[in-house]
Amino acid sequence: MKTWEKNIRRVEPYVPGEQPKVKDVVKLNTNENPYPPTPKVHEAAERMNISDLRLYPDPEVTDLVHAIAAYYGMNDNQVFVGVGSDDVLSMCFLTFFNSDKPILFPNISYSFYSVWADLYRIPYEKQPLDKDFNIIPEDYYKGNGGVVFPNPNAPTALYMELDKVEDIIKHNQDVVVIVDEAYIDFGGKSAMELVNKYENVLVVQTFSKSRSMAGMRIGYCFGNPELIKALNDVKFSFNSYTMNRTSISYGIESVNDKEYFEECVGKIVKTRENAKERLSQLGFSFPDSKANFIFATHKSVPAKEIFEKLKEKNIFVRYFNQPLIDNYLRITIGTDEQMEKLYAALEEITGQVK
């Protein structure tokens, strides 16, 4: 082995959901929003002066930060914006998890957590969920170097009540606690109100799910000004211009259109509740989803078999080939039309064609 090969930092990378190259598919595998962004984004695109692209964007993302802060009733210095919530979370890991003690997160959770920990050489311990896939707050009361968990959790879609979230924070006031709320808009109460109560809390959200902007890559978090300043210091040490002009412009229009946002979320929640009934009738069981997806297992047909047969029909869902969840499928909530195609295919695959 060459000397330079020995010095390569090797990690097991995160594996994203498949992005089919063909167009005629039912894509229910990456928890994207099935509806387009607010029409105001299209209007912003038409107004954009292409000549301005020769100029660097605002490194402090001032206008978008202000729009987000105003929408949620926070101060500008309590908001950090990044290139998707993955970028925000990665910066959080790098900035705040520098102890010799292990950070704690669930064993069935967002798999990027362990990737970042390995990349940044952060020790970590995965905490088991209970038999029903619930996070056990007491497991996070021990000494640690930080805590991070999604709420609702992914891929289980289970929401943990805010009083339990606060219990975890209360027992960890000497470290930073990150609540990853990528799916919070589809059910449950945000931990955002705890930001002004506890100085060690960061609440991370995204435009990728409820705001139909996965292609723009906009994420953000709320925290006390000292935490936000530390994040910006680290961000500027990597790249001063992380957000491009189009992302900033479209993000502002998206966050300002509350009516359209609530309409889209309402449609997804309605379709999700119908999906619970339809999937149950087809022999599936699942935790009670508060996200824009359902984590389902069938009573007789293996998940991998269903996954493969759906793919043959150009219907894409997510299968996780890992212990404890290898007989589950994560099914994104699509439009009613997409879901009807899914149900028809599942009726055939599970032998329940009427």
Regions found by a protein language model. Name each.
Residues 1-55, 143:
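N-terminal "arm"/small-domain region of PLP-dependent enzymes with the aminotransferase-like
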Residues 60, 200-280, 284-287:
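PLP-dependent aminotransferase class I/II
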Residues 62-102, 300:
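Phosphate-binding glycine-rich loop
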Residues 95-116:
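Conserved PLP-anchoring active-site segment centered on the Schiff-base-forming lysine
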Residues 125, 130-185:
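Active-site phosphate-binding strand-loop segment of PLP-dependent enzymes
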Residues 163, 309-318, 322-354:
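PLP-dependent enzyme catalytic core of the Aspartate aminotransferase-like
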Residues 269, 281-313:
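Conserved PLP-binding catalytic core of the aspartate aminotransferase-like
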